[in-house]
């Protein structure tokens, strides 16, 4: 018996290490608020692509990815070259922040922007991977010199999405999932989804290996308890995955097409055009009344800053939804490999 005891202990240890890790603690509102407060602070000067504020944001996100447990964290540099053109007459009718941003775009010329990329390695990789992304750039200094507050801080658009991606990465790194999960914070989204296009043009892995991609954008709008709406290509095989994940968390489904007009205005669109199965899921695009109120009052203006009454209830629910989405997508049992269905539209 004494001789068998060491072997028995070794076998028991092996069984213990093979057990799946316990579910991670849920993401809390305070976590998102803390990260948003940093990225949307005046010290980052609105995170306009190609500026010191943007570089500072990229360094901060890279450090947060590393601290979360991601490996292979790097900055993916890409060139942005804008040839000056005459601004359309309609630009005069745009909100001041957006108009000044267009004027700055028109005179900037060439500069270098940076995506932030990191990976949480899978424990049983099968040549397939998951991508979770959000853009971190915004409009920078967007108001005239005579204005008291000149900085477009971009708290909702899109420090909220980046905060969620970081929080998801922190959970995923503890879960021991089968497949690799890549976390991407894109730059120059406001310039025409350029960071997402750069990632698709020079990805750290073959695009065909990506079987599920999730984009988070402008999530701090809706309160908790909102149904889950999904922006995606028609016929995407991910719909059943999202429905199941939402149902497991007690959330209802919003299957109408009210938010279809936003499909081409977010980074997932640029990647979907390259055949990647990309979705954007959550409550913000289920409550168009609240979303349109934000777009009319604070979007692309100095008013988009973190306040004590900034709505983060729905953002927390959406962040936790994405932990569950990644858990399912990165499981070889729960989500077998499949091909993308790159048709334009929404379900």
Residue locations for each model-derived region?
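A non-catalytic alpha/beta surface segment that caps or lines the substrate-entry region
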Residues: 47-120
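Second-shell loop/turn segments in exported
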Residues: 20-26, 42-52, 101-107, 146-158, ...
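Extracytoplasmic/secreted proteins, especially bacterial periplasmic and envelope-associated proteins
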Residues: 27, 31-34, 38, 52-64, ...
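N-terminal hydrophobic or amphipathic helices/low-complexity stretches enriched
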Residues: 15-72, 120-121, 126, 339
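His/Asp/Glu-rich mid-to-C-terminal helical/loop segments that flank catalytic regions of hydrolases
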Residues: 170, 174, 289-347
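Metal-dependent peptidase/peptidase-like ectodomains
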Residues: 125, 177, 186-290
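Structural recognition of the beta-strand scaffold that forms the well-ordered cores
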Residues: 37-40, 74, 117-119, 129-133, ...
